[in-house]
Structure formats: structure tokens, C-alpha cells
């Protein structure tokens, strides 16, 4: 019995493994483009890790993000955004781009 529990615990350990920045999905952002993130269910909580990004939640399943200013280098990490709903949590690294065509305008989670 105890051996079975130990095997089960070892097998699910990867499911609850810690995620690092390197493993996170990255969204490119630009101060001239609003990035809209839409969840499939109501968003309960949003955290933006720095004050370099402005954000709001105009409706219960949507957030809008935009860099506050444009004095950044290409590829610079401006923030990590965490989105929590009833059933899941998503995290994205927001990377600055000077090229408007690379900025993400819409993301569904």
C-alpha cells in the first residue's frame, strides 16, 4: 500500500513542478498597441509584477495591457502577468518589441 502511494506521488510530481521564466509563454508588447487577453471564464485575480505595464479589466473575462512608455530595448522583460480564474492560472512574460507588427493584440486563455 505504501509503495503504491510512493509511486503515485513520484508520478504526479512533474504535474506540480515549479514553472520558471524560461518555460513561460511570452507575449510581445509595444506602447502603441493594446494587448487584450480574454479568458474562457470570469477572471478572479490579475497580478502585474512591475509598474512598467498599465492594465485594467473592462469586463469580467477580459484584461487590457500596455507598456506605460516606450524607452525599452527589444526583448526586455517588462513584467510577468498572472491571471487566475476559478479553474486555472496562467502566467505570461511580457517582452517589449519596437516593431509594431510583432506586438500581440489578442490572446485567448
Regions found by a protein language model. Give the residues of each.
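A general "mature secreted/periplasmic domain" signal
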Residues: 14-109
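Bacterial N-terminal signal peptides
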Residues: 1-11
Amino acid at each position: 500500500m505504501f509503495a503504491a502511494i510512493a509511486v503515485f506521488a513520484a508520478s504526479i510530481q512533474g504535474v506540480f513542478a515549479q514553472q520558471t521564466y524560461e518555460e513561460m509563454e511570452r507575449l510581445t508588447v509595444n506602447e502603441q498597441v493594446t494587448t487584450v487577453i480574454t479568458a474562457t471564464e470570469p477572471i478572479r485575480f490579475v497580478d502585474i509584477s512591475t509598474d512598467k505595464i498599465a492594465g485594467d479589466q473592462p469586463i469580467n473575462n477580459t484584461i487590457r495591457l500596455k507598456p506605460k512608455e516606450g524607452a525599452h530595448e527589444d526583448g526586455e522583460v517588462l513584467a510577468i502577468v498572472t491571471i487566475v480564474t476559478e479553474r486555472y492560472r496562467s502566467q505570461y512574460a511580457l517582452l517589449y518589441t519596437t516593431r509594431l507588427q510583432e506586438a500581440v493584440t489578442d490572446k485567448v486563455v
